[in-house]
Amino acid sequence: MTEIINVTAREILDSRGNPTIEVEVAVGTGDVGRAAVPSGASTGEHEALELRDGDKGRYLGKGVRKAIANVMDEIAPAVVGLDAGDQAVLDQRMIELDGTATKSKLGANAILGVSLAAAKAAAQAHGLPLYRYVGGAGARTLPVPLMNILNGGAHADSNVDIQEFMVVPLGAPSFAEALRYGAEVFHALKAVLKKKGAGTGVGDEGGYAPNLASNEEALALIMKAIEQAGLKAGDDVGLALDCAASEFFEKSSGKYDLEGEGKAFDGKGLVDFYASLAAKYPIVSIEDGCAEDDWATWKLLTERLGSKLQLVGDDLFVTNVTRLSRGIAEGVANSILVKVNQIGSLTETLEAVRMAHRAGYTSVMSHRSGETEDTTIADLSVACDCGQIKTGSASRTDRVAKYNQLLRIEEELGKAARYAGRDAFRALR
């Protein structure tokens, strides 16, 4: 019934105007699944390879015609005839066809597009929403949105070093109300920034991208916005940071250089910096607080703050079970960021989430800075029981599309729906 009968691919544009790949998989029932692959701005060194053309005369070298050719000429002949409902077999066939550790032969973007499109086709053929098809009958937990309302680092042209400042509506009674909390703080922050004379242009993920005196000033302004929105910081809304520390780590000196505020720290100094922020503000989560291969400072950070805060590994783990298993064994971090294109297949993504949950780590489903209207990660956040999702601010359709899909899922679940709230954060339980 769900035998794959056709695979096609095309080049489309993502939210930054760069090409990406979109794949359609058709099955014997006549159902067709479609998936568009996202792309990151700050990418970890250990991520699966996103295959680009490299032709500087076309899309500045960022075209994906090579990946499309690999889908049409290599992957399609190998998967036509397979059952789209047997995700593990399908993904393993593509992984073996590629034969490299980082999917560099065919491209992780090519493999992932087929992987996700096949899952969608199978879900449609079975008459099930994607979250139910992947997650089963127990999939009913709506995630807490970690809403990136102020952008810095690689996501903005500003002097703010920390990449994302997020509001976390952990005290809301439902996802719909959580989204309202976040949107109202987002709008309040615009008024706060305007009053200060700061810019209100937005970055890649829809958050404001002003020039500020320091990273701490960003937190102070968000606290003011929470208050002006009529909400209580710490109870209704917490704060979260994505430091993307690999972006400001100087390998030659071993120092973390916060250029925007003229400070440089060694590992211990950086941990002290985070501890001082956490003592002053209701921060519930810090992502990529240390560089991706600075395991010693990660260990120090976990020992210092791991019992109080969620410490999320993004570039550290890259949704890879090998790196995650090392982190678990060494007691590093306590949460994993889940990005489907970091590893390049749905099966491997699900394996990483299962490993994290077995070890008592939390998981956060995440978008990339280069997104499309595709809403797959919204369904996957519910299917995987992540309890948290990062998909940008309350602006830009590529971000809001995921939130709107979660609103639909919550409505469809009705009284069975459960909003994760504070329970999504191990340290707050």
Curated annotation (Swiss-Prot):
GO terms for biological process: glycolytic process. Keywords: Cytoplasm, Glycolysis, Lyase, Magnesium, Metal-binding, Secreted. (2R)-2-phosphoglycerate binds at Q163, K339, R368, S369, K390. It catalyses: (2R)-2-phosphoglycerate = phosphoenolpyruvate + H2O. Pathway: Carbohydrate degradation; glycolysis; pyruvate from D-glyceraldehyde 3-phosphate: step 4/5. SUPFAM superfamilies: Enolase C-terminal domain-like, Enolase N-terminal domain-like. The gene is eno. One of its GO terms (molecular function) is phosphopyruvate hydratase activity. Its EC number is 4.2.1.11. It holds the Pfam family Enolase_C. It is found in: Cytoplasm; Secreted; Cell surface. PROSITE patterns: ENOLASE. Catalyzes the reversible conversion of 2-phosphoglycerate (2-PG) into phosphoenolpyruvate (PEP). It is essential for the degradation of carbohydrates via glycolysis. Its cofactor is Mg(2+). Binds a second Mg(2+) ion via substrate during catalysis. Mg(2+) binds at D242, E287, D314. This is Enolase. GO terms for cellular component: cell surface; extracellular region; phosphopyruvate hydratase complex. NCBIfam families: eno. It comes from Anaeromyxobacter sp. (strain Fw109-5).
